[in-house]
Every structure is written in C-alpha cells, then in structure tokens.
C-alpha cells in the first residue's frame, strides 16, 4: 500500500501519479488461453511454378511482392516433414505424437488469404531445382535485413550465399551490397509466422537434410528476449547457478524485473515450446523478456559480465532513465566477489585421498574480503566498509576496462570505460 502524502499548509491529501505511457507486457501462455491456433493467412491457389518465377524475378528487380514471397515459401516448404521421437506439446496444444510425421505448417492453422495476389513476371528458366536454394536465400535475407551495421550485413550476405551454393549449383546472387528492399519484410505478420514455423520445426529436427535453412531463421528464436539472455550469459561467465545468481540481486528494480521474467507457466525452459517464437508468431506484442521492459536487470547483468571480462557485453545497449549509481555498485560488488574467488574444489579422488576444508572463525577482519561467493558474507563486508566501493574494487574495475577500445556510444562498454577508467 502506498504511503499517504499530505501538504504541510493544510494537511490535504494528494495522490501522486504518472501517466500510463507504456503498454503492459504480454505473456505467451495468455495467448493460448484465448486462442486455439496461430493462424497463417497465405494464398494457396497459385501454382508453385508460377510463384517461383514471380519471386525470383521480383527479388532480381528489387521489388518483390511479400504476398508472392509468403505464397512461394508455403508452397515450396509445405511438404517437408519429420518423424517425431517423442510427443510434441506446447501450451496444451498437441503438435504431434511420438512416431508421427509432422510438417512445418502443422505448427499453425493455414487459412486462405482473401487478398488477390498481384501479377508477377514469368520465367521459363526456373525449375524445381531452384527450390533447393531460393527459400534459403529469402529467409536469409530476413536475417540480413534485421542488422543495421553495414559491415555485419555484408558478412551475413556472404555467408548466406555460401549456404545457397552448397544447397544447389543453380544458385544465383540476386542482391547486391547496399540494397535494403527486404528490410521491411519483418513488418509482415504472415511472413514472420512462416519464419518462426520454419525455425521451430528445424530446431526440433536439427539433423534434417533441409535444416541449413535455419541460417536465416535462427534470429527468430528468442527474439526480443535480450534480458533473459543476459541472465543466462551472466550465469555462464560468473560460474554461478541461476539460483545462486538470483541471491545476488540487490536492487528493487532488478528484483521486480526478474520476477516479471520468471512469471510461471511460460515454458521458458522448454526447448520445443512456442515461447521462443512468441514475437514472430504474434503471441505477444510486448515481450516480458526484452531489455526495453527490463532495463535495470539488463544493465546490471551486462555490466557485471563486462567486469568479468565478457567480450560480448561491451556492445550491449545502455538503457536510458535508470538508477545508474546503485545498479553500478551492485554490479561491481558481484563481479568483484566472483573475480576475487576461484570456485575450484576437488572433483574426483582415489582411495581415501580426499581434501576437506576446515572453517576458521577465530579471526574476522572487516577489511579482508570473504573467500567464497556467499552474498551474505559479501554484504556484511561491504557494509563494514561503509557501504561503498573500496579502492580494491575500483582497481578491479579499472583493470577490467583498461584495454577496451573502439567502443560505440550508448553501450555498456562505453559507460564502464568512462565510469571506471579514470
């Protein structure tokens, strides 16, 4: 219950409020409480031979119709199937039973698109052999289009062309460097549902002969789940279990956001779930796991990872409008505790040659850091030292960031460099 605020001059009560300027998060399980299926609207009445030509010529000219793209991908991939080695169930929806054959579009309910397809350009030179590389190319362009960094786009495009060459000797490069007409494809909900269905299917059937198509679709998995990825990444670089890491959450904002992400019943830890594809399948408009909805958690986790020498953390986005001071201290204490203690112990032994530690409680000095990684011990030590970073902590952080170079603005790396390398 919020405290009562009164004005001194007359004891009148006021209720401070802020405008509700953000949409609430949407959980994937809630979608299936109100909907039985994920509906994909696509045209199924045009022949594959025609669609293949329309798409090829459209991409080559730099102006393909997304309706042609969707219809072609459906027609070219609808026959791909795999045999389940276990029941496949997600959010109460049975996708298939053990030993049954399932197809990519069994993951959705396909309904006929009511909009008529536009005319396309024919091409007598196209054949079924093109279906071995053209779907890979289209879905790979989706991945290229999601990147805004020029050099990385070129790297992705080069990798995509290599994948297509492996798939078929008929491959032709249709897109030159610098073109971006495919960037808008992710705005089409039916296209992204196809992307999600393809990746979810081949994530289940990783050894399928068509699985290399995931080169382009893999970015659909855990889309807008950066804060959740931060949790896993910090657990890896710190060596702490997620349970132990949770006890190191020392800020209310971080705790609130962690509780938001750990809301039960969402199949976060179920590898074959719809959950990782909730954005592209349209199950959620606002991810509960994004860095936008969990800015304090994302900042705390990425800064701690950076101070533990994570190379990828330096490019993580720095959120705006968060309480930097307390979050920075919490990240520094966690990283200093982990960085000052090696989590090593004997794992195997022969005969009776087994080492056991002995606790020595005879002397406890507040200026001597704890030896382990117990958060209670470290908080006691931190309080004994005035509740602020010690010179050793600041030197630890300075060493961690001293070699960082070529840092982009508004990144965790840039923030840490300015904050600690003084």
From Swiss-Prot:
The SS bond pairs are: none
Q: Where is this region: Interaction with the phosphoprotein?
A: 350-390
UniProt-annotated location(s): Virion; Host cytoplasm
**GO molecular function list:** RNA binding
InterPro entries per record: Rhabdo_ncapsid (IPR000448), Rhabdovirus_ncapsid_C (IPR023331), Rhabdovirus_ncapsid_N (IPR023330), Rhabdovirus_nucleoprotein-like (IPR035961)
SUPFAM superfamilies tied to this protein: Rhabdovirus nucleoprotein-like (SSF140809)
Q: Name one GO cellular component term.
A: viral nucleocapsid
The protein's name is Nucleoprotein
């Amino acid at each position: 219950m919020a405290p009562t605020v009164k004005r001194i001059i007359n004891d009148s009560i006021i209720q401070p409020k802020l405008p509700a300027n953000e949409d609430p998060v949407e959980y994937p399980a809630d979608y299936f409480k109100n909907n039985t299926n994920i509906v994909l609207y696509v045209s199924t009445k045009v022949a594959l031979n025609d669609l293949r030509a329309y798409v090829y010529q459209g991409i080559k000219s730099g102006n393909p119709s997304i309706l042609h793209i969707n219809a072609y991908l459906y027609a070219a991939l609808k026959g791909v199937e795999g045999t389940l080695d276990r029941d496949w169930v997600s959010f109460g929806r049975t996708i298939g039973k053990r030993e049954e054959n399932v197809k990519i579009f069994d993951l959705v309910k396909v309904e006929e698109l009511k909009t008529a397809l536009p005319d396309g350009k024919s091409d007598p030179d196209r054949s079924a052999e093109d279906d071995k590389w053209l779907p890979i190319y289209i879905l790979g362009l989706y991945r290229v289009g999601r990147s805004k960094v020029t050099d990385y786009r070129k790297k992705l495009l080069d990798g995509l062309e290599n994948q297509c060459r492996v798939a078929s000797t008929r491959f032709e490069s249709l897109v030159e460097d610098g073109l971006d007409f495919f960037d808008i494809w992710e705005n089409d909900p039916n296209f992204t549902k196809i992307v999600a269905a393809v990746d979810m299917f081949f994530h289940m059937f990783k050894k399928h002969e068509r699985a290399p198509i995931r080169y382009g679709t893999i970015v659909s998995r855990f889309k807008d789940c950066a804060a959740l990825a931060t949790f896993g990444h910090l657990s890896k670089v710190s060596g702490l279990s997620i349970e132990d890491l949770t006890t190191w959450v020392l800020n209310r904002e971080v705790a609130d956001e962690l509780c938001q992400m750990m809301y039960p019943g969402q199949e976060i830890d179920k590898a074959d779930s719809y959950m990782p594809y909730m954005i592209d399948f349209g199950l959620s408009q606002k991810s509960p796991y994004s860095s936008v909805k969990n800015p304090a958690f994302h900042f705390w986790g990425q800064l701690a990872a950076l101070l533990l020498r994570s190379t990828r953390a330096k490019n993580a986005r720095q959120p705006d409008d968060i309480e930097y001071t307390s979050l920075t201290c919490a990240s520094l204490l966690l990283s200093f505790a982990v960085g000052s203690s090696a989590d090593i112990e004997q794992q195997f032994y022969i005969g009776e040659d087994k080492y056991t530690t002995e606790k020595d409680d005879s002397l406890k000095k507040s200026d001597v850091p704890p030896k382990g990684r117990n958060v209670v011990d470290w908080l006691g030590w931190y309080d004994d030292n005035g509740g602020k970073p010690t010179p050793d902590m600041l030197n630890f952080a300075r060493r961690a960031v001293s070699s960082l170079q070529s840092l982009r603005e508004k990144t965790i790396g840039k923030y840490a460099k300015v904050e600690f390398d003084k």
